[in-house]
């Protein structure tokens, strides 16, 4: 094992922590927690359930932020003590434990540093993710299903609850589309950098001649609407269609017309839901996602108007944001950040944190440059 200069490393940890602490504004965070705690303790809090939910959720988020900061500084202090004991007693086991903890704290600081970059209006929100198969036939449908598994595994690794809201199966294999929620703080801010067109290059398992196939899938990420958001859609602006839920291969999985498709007529926005048991539940879920999409659309339009004054009306990540090449070599590469990984199996198993972190930093740099 290479010799580690623990004194220098611990100084570096404290410097990184200090910069994060400054950005997080701990005193303001504590004041926010005190104010929210006072409001959460009011006897008439639940007279307005929607407002109460927002207050308690925000309080939980703020308390978690402060706890993460306090835990990290304690871990750095404990590491310093462990190193001193290990060096005084010339204990190889203690020094090995210290080396492992050093690496773990570095990772925790890196994760927290990325969270401090999530300062967008909706970044704290939970997320709704939709994956759609693009060009490439059955390979594109299979790719869409691979991406669904990748994001669900990513969420599982982080302990984030997920809810699959809708799945539309392709006839031969894979998915035409899938929609799911990630029910965790900052899920939208984190996953929004995954939005865009993903490209897969591989030898097609569905081609009898074993030819190489390029296929595409689109990923959409929107913030989950909260009950206190003012998004009212007049009934005459929504067209409602009902149909039977379908499973793999196009087979019907329900004998009643429980699936629901909502179309927002002014914008052409379409949302389908079929995973709930009743038409009423599917309609409520579809309406929630439709409201979320319209909320984001409104924000994007406002941002575009502001950017137009500065001569910048670009409002997308571009078409192809990441390539997954499985043949003739193995490489996953983000075309915006240039970050790349050769272990494609690990990526498809949900190990995408480095891609997300690089994407968030790239987005922050672009925003700062624009300002």
UniProtKB/Swiss-Prot annotation:
Write the record's keywords in alphabetical order, separated by commas: Cytoplasm, Methylation, Protein biosynthesis
Q: Where in the cell is it found?
A: Cytoplasm
Which InterPro entries does this chain map to?
PCRF, Pep_chain_release_fac_I, Pep_chain_release_fac_I_sf, PrfB
Coiled-coil annotation reads: none
User: Where are the N5-methylglutamine modifications?
Assistant: 251
A Pfam family this chain is assigned to: PCRF
Q: Name one GO cellular component term.
A: cytoplasm
What does the entry report about post-translational modification of this chain? Methylated by PrmC. Methylation increases the termination efficiency of RF2.
Kindly report the protein's main subcellular placement as a broad class: cytoplasm
SMART domains attached to this UniProt entry = PCRF
GO molecular function (one): translation release factor activity, codon specific
Q: Which family does it belong to?
A: Belongs to the prokaryotic/mitochondrial release factor family.
**Which HAMAP family does the UniProt record give?**
Rel_fac_2
What does the UniProt record say this protein does? Peptide chain release factor 2 directs the termination of translation in response to the peptide chain termination codons UGA and UAA.
Q: What is this protein called?
A: Peptide chain release factor 2
Tell me what organism the protein belongs to: Arthrobacter sp. (strain FB24)
Give the gene name: prfB
